[in-house]
Swiss-Prot record:
Pfam families: Iso_dh
InterPro entries according to UniProt: IsoCit/isopropylmalate_DH_CS, IsoPropMal-DH-like_dom, Isopropylmalate_DH
Localization in the cell: Cytoplasm
Keywords, ordered alphabetically: Amino-acid biosynthesis, Branched-chain amino acid biosynthesis, Cytoplasm, Leucine biosynthesis, Magnesium, Manganese, Metal-binding, NAD, Oxidoreductase
Residues annotated as binding Mg(2+): 228, 252, 256
Residues holding substrate: 100, 110, 139, 228
PANTHER family, alphabetized: 3-ISOPROPYLMALATE DEHYDROGENASE
Gene source species: Vibrio vulnificus (strain CMCP6)
Organism placement in taxonomy: Bacteria, Pseudomonadati, Pseudomonadota, Gammaproteobacteria, Vibrionales
Protein's recorded name: 3-isopropylmalate dehydrogenase
Family that this chain belongs to: Belongs to the isocitrate and isopropylmalate dehydrogenases family. LeuB type 1 subfamily.
Catalytic activity, EC: 1.1.1.85
Amino acid sequence: MTDKTYKIAVLPGDGIGPEVMAQAHKVLDAIEKKHAIHFEREEHDVGGIAIDNHGCPLPQSTVTACEESDAVLFGSVGGPKWEHLPPNDQPERGALLPLRKHFQLFCNLRPAQIHSGLEAFSPLRADISGRGFDIVVVRELTGGIYFGQPKGREGEGANEKAYDTEIYHRFEIERIAKIAFESARLRRKKVCSIDKANVLQSSILWREVVEELAKDYPDVELSHMYIDNATMQLIKDPAQFDVMLCSNIFGDIISDECAMITGSMGMLPSASLNESKFGLYEPAGGSAPDIAGKNIANPVAQILSAALMLRYSLGEEAAAQDIENAVSQALAAGELTADLAGDKPALSTAEMGDKIAQYILNS
């Protein structure tokens, strides 16, 4: 049987990006050995290193490589070296936002969970974190109040005013809700849709459309929750949630809250998808230039981003689960990088990558 081949554009970027990406490569190598899969991988410049080498944060050659690939595995961009540049020329705004726009990445997926043995890092009370949680926030990324028109400021003195417009079209709600329901089918089959339908017209439409779409997913349990209650319930009982479906602004709030209650940002991957399931996969954290090159960064978020890539863009669920299980095994065995080890001996970035790859091969 011939191996399935996937073409991956690998964009390590700046700061800790290259060293954590090297660990994702090790894990993908292990997946190739275990499964009938081959990854054709090419690395390309993005962010600050692209400014240094090409004069701009997102060279056309990088965009072309992404267009010719099945998915993009992204590291991190930015650092003090480029902060003097105009905002639109800086690595973050000049690379990530144009990539999202170019590929019409309307859906952001942010998993958040407490891994066994890491409960103490959560700011939640021990009896709450001890129950564990495993949530995926499905956030609409291109609509809503951040992009709705009109927006602006006018007037002066006491009559000066500013305004933004929350707009959602039926098709925007349908396509993001579809991803939430399909994600739930791969998990515990529960979707909680977050809105403010007691006040906002956009939320009333949101709820109506989600209810209609739910009829196509009779195996998935749908519930609704107002955003203000949802932020409280995440603190009180996060274990009740499986997939949380959110508009742009509500998802912005909820995904950051979910990240914080895990207590370990270095562990959190994210995915941004378009309608054809093409995606950009990246750690939720930043480029951490203060620890770059020291071989101490936690590579788990980058490795789990590769697992999301396998699941959502490539449809390789078994391989994705192998990576996630290997990460869980390493953490449960107390194999931790410096950000989590505390007083115990810490693994280096490279050692953590080696451990996780070995767990995959041994499974």
